[in-house]
Amino acid sequence: MTEKRKSPALRFRGYTDDWEQRKLSELTSMHARIGWQNLRTSEFLDSGNYMLITGTDFNDGAINFSTCHYVERERYEQDRNIQIHNGSILITKDGTLGKVAYVQGLSMPATLNAGVFNVQIKDANNVDEKYLFQYLKAPFLMDYVDKKATGGTIKHLNQSILVDFPVILPQRSEQTLIGAFFQQLDNLITLHQRKPLDKSSNLILTGIA
């Protein structure tokens, strides 16, 4: 982005409006399993009716349900803010920081283990979930985190770091087109077993070569 141009040069046909910059905290609320709710490994079940998603279950922007453990109903119901549904956006905050996943194909109730944020969109009429997922999955987020590190190493991605992360928003209908475009691109990449095209994401979302 430049000061003279508030939208990328590469656009979908018919869209000319400027894009706006908002803070992630203005668009979403972020929740994680807090300390007193932490699970012991002895509570992890090999089967059950309530799935437990951890950061190690993230796989190329999705959740590998085959690696997930399960928990008792009481643990699932403990916190509604970390109950996961299809369309949920998740970010790892411990271990490998900043990995992002979009939940699809979930067939049962699910909750989060410690170390993962549930990013909930406040107004679905203003923000498209697939657009936001693709924006967070692009290198912008980790570039921002690296700058916040100021020469050190961030071992935990705290909410205080994420709240001011800038998100560039086109109008809602254009977000939907962009999100769908990248979803199709991801599907093609998966089909051909190639790595995500991070540089292409940067180019199309910013219009900067």
PLM feature spans:
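DNA target-recognition patches
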Residues: 25-28, 40-75, 119
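Non-catalytic DNA-recognition/assembly elements of restriction-modification systems
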Residues: 11-35
